[in-house]
Amino acid sequence: MSSVPAPREYFLDSIRAWLMLLGIPFHISLIYSTHSWHVNSATPSWWLTLFNDFIHAFRMQVFFVISGYFSYMLFLRYPLKRWWKVRVERVGIPMLTAIPLLTLPQFILLQYVKEKTENWPTLSAYEKYNTLAWELISHLWFLLVLVILTTVSIGIFTWFQKRQETSKPRPAAISLAKLSLIFFLLGVAYAAIRRIIFIVYPAILSDGMFNFIVMQTLFYVPFFILGALAFIHPDLKARFTTPSRGCTLGAAVAFIAYLLNQRYGSGDAWMYETESVITMVMGLWMVNVVFSLGHRLLNFQSARVTYFVNASLFIYLVHHPLTLFFGAYITPHISSNLIGFLCGLIFVMGIALILYEIHLRIPLLKFLFSGKPPVKQESRAAIG
């Protein structure tokens, strides 16, 4: 355990917050995209589809790198049991709170919007369970994955710490080219695992809990570990905060490949396996693009930025049902996709900020949506 706090990484705090907030335009643009979602506009927009695909291709990979970075930083600061307890509470309590307060009402809303209420009694017990798994976890899936990664990383982080204590500090002698090869091979390995599952027991890939607990965790664990390694090796972090033309061009080419795979790939063939390889390497390259831009533009302290850093998780949690409400009841009355998209941003962000301010004034809600217990103020009054 280290008693010396690490310097504040303002740009990483900011990037993490903006990646969370990108979930709002991501889901609103999904309404107007060619992708089939819970609610869609009458006519899709090609440019909002492109915008949606771009966000989807890299956002969570970069997010999990930052999560791994801060997780290991806190691992060195706290005793093991306290570290695990704090980390799990910070993500687990908001997730468990959001299920009854947000995703359950959202599920009920969608049942009426999609006129599925009459079909519910006809479903089998497993179909009901699986439907609830998908719908109640919903956009909270990354919190569940973070709980799993935090638990799994206990052994990995302990091993990293012992290596740091027993060996002399040395540079992480690995270039971005070598990292790209490693992540390409990791993408191929993930694709192979998925293909084997598809051949042996394809039905399990449609199981919500299996998807969240196994498949999503397997895909994002390399990015989580990479974040921890970036904290351990400052030279590795420097590779990500230094602009790389190769990474920028590589990410652009990977995104084109991603779009072509979306356009011409088939789910019954190799589309999902190909996508996993593409998004694995694109995610790595976008870490460089996002970190270098963030380091140059966001590495400063600002009260306004700090406000959104603190508010980002709450806003992300509440934005999803607000977006679905907007798509179901307001989108049909707006003929222009552009105007609808902009109105959606204003509607969702405006209400989310109002709800955020309200919840700050209710201690129980503030605890439930942050996982942070209230700080006890010691009385300064003197007796006698």
From Swiss-Prot:
UniProt cross-references to Pfam families, sorted A to Z: Acyl_transf_3
Coiled coil: none
GO molecular-function term, one example from the UniProt record: acyltransferase activity, transferring groups other than amino-acyl groups
Family: Belongs to the acyltransferase 3 family. OpgC subfamily.
Lineage, opening ranks: Bacteria, Pseudomonadati, Pseudomonadota, Gammaproteobacteria, Enterobacterales
Cellular component annotations (GO), alphabetically ordered: plasma membrane
Chief localization: membrane
Originating gene: mdoC
Domain of life per record: Bacteria
Ranges annotated as spanning the membrane: 17-37, 54-74, 91-111, 140-160, 173-193, 212-232, 240-260, 274-294, 311-331, 338-358
The protein, known as: Glucans biosynthesis protein C
Biological processes annotated in GO: glucan biosynthetic process
Enzyme Commission number(s): 2.1.-.-
Biological or metabolic pathway of the protein: Glycan metabolism; osmoregulated periplasmic glucan (OPG) biosynthesis
Purpose of the protein: Necessary for the succinyl substitution of periplasmic glucans. Could catalyze the transfer of succinyl residues from the cytoplasmic side of the membrane to the nascent glucan backbones on the periplasmic side of the membrane.
HAMAP family listed in its UniProt record: MdoC_OpgC
Matches recorded under PANTHER family: BLR4337 PROTEIN, GLUCANS BIOSYNTHESIS PROTEIN C
Mode of membrane association: Multi-pass membrane protein
Localization in the cell: Cell membrane
UniProt keyword list: Acyltransferase, Cell membrane, Membrane, Transferase, Transmembrane, Transmembrane helix
